């Protein structure tokens, strides 16, 4: 055991998993925060069609440039789509890669009867759903950026028969994001020290489900 051997040992440490973990957590946090903001902005329709109209025009730059530039919406959607791909690539290394692995995972999850393990399984399932449905939604936003507003969005939802997709997407993204933030807080030790960690975790779980239910 000498300085040279220790230096060689350090040089052989594979830091890629740690970096991928960091990328996964950071991109997931960014996507979850974006989703919360997105849901609050979309809910402007509850204040009336004029409120949602002004929100849509704001993101087209009307109040900055004096005229709408739907390309700004395309750029935002493309950036979110790229971030989603980065997050998916970083997370996929932890997901089962075959039917046999999924079956084994489900069997172990049932035998463990551990709530947080079930949450991870739900996150895997909702992640698979989001890989398809979120891509469809973002592609629509990128290719039809001017069709966002109280009338256009309602027409797409009803006449375009997109409501089943958006309904499944809503539940999937809220479950995935809420569980992800809960697990992120636990993983990186962001909770303050407590004399009763179990009670603290239960409070965090209740907070997570309350926020998910709110959105």
Predicted regions and their residues:
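Membrane-embedded alpha-helical bundles that constitute the cytochrome b-like, heme-associated redox core
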Residues: 1-215
């Amino acid at each position: 055991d000498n300085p040279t051997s220790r230096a060689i040992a350090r040089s052989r440490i594979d830091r890629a998993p740690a970096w991928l973990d960091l990328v996964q957590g950071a991109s997931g946090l960014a996507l979850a925060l974006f989703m919360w903001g997105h849901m609050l902005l979309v809910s402007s329709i509850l204040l009336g069609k004029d409120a949602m109209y002004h929100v849509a025009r704001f993101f087209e730059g009307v109040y900055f440039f004096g005229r709408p530039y739907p390309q700004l919406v395309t750029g935002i959607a493309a950036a979110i789509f790229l971030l989603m791909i980065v997050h998916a690539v970083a997370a996929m290394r932890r997901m089962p890669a075959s039917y046999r692995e999924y079956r084994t995972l489900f069997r172990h999850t049932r035998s463990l009867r551990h709530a947080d393990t079930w949450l991870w399984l739900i996150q895997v399932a909702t992640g698979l759903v989001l890989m398809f449905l979120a891509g469809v939604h973002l592609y629509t936003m990128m290719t039809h950026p001017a069709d966002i507003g109280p009338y256009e969005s309602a027409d797409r939802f009803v006449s375009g028969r997109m409501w089943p997709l958006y309904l499944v997407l809503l539940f999937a993204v809220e479950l995935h994001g809420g569980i992800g933030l809960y697990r992120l807080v636990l993983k990186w030790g962001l909770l303050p020290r407590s004399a009763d960690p179990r009670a603290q975790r239960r409070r965090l779980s209740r907070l997570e489900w309350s926020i998910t239910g709110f959105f």
